[in-house]
Amino acid sequence: MDGKVMIEEYIRTLKRKGFGGMLVSDHDSYDGYREWKNAIKGRAHQDFVVLKGVEYDTCDCGHILVIMPFGVKLKILELRGLPGSILVKIVHAYGGILGPAHPYGEKFMSMISTNERKKKYQQRIAQLLPQFDFVEIFNACESAETNAKAKRLAEKFNKPGFGGSDAHRLDCIGKAYTELPDTIRSEDNLIAYVKTCPQIDCGGEHYNGTTKDRIGRLNMVLVDSFYFYNKLANGWRWRKRRRELFDIIEKKL
């Protein structure tokens, strides 16, 4: 989940489709999960599990999904722009797990696609890939070809796979699934399970209502503009990110 649909609408829609829970993973923000925690949790939908995650925008590895243990709060995970190598160290130092989202998706947003265009990063990425805990191998907004490549990547490094709907719009909710035991009721449960499970069943159906489906070749202009937006956003948050990073280094790294 990283769209603008209200979080309770996600829950209602997923429950109607037979889902028992979801991972909330907004881009560089926990606002969606906060809405659940502050306004809904304990009051409604107590038969539905909502877990906390984030889709972090790195400066060199595209989008990375991050899940931290219950109670761990790091402001830096809402300040986009860290290098992938630093993000891995921070997440693991605090007991979390992480993995690339849609690794063969759009350039600048996806780990492999980003770095295929930057030969100087290839060795760095080769060193980084084994350190991830999982790979998103099915994304409902990606093609069968790119999802197949992501699955082969996970198999190469013996990593479990996740499925994600990447639902920015209401009609995309529930297009993908990840099969998990009913015993997983918290982030800690999920982290422990992923660390000990080499294979996780996941999949879904392709969603053909994405922006790139609707505007065709013009989508490349949008993707290129994202590159400049990402650079500006990273620079804007540089001071805050540096301050948070120094604090983490003193405590953990």
Where are these regions (language model features)?
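Short glycine-enriched loops at secondary-structure junctions
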Residues: V54-D60, Y104, A167
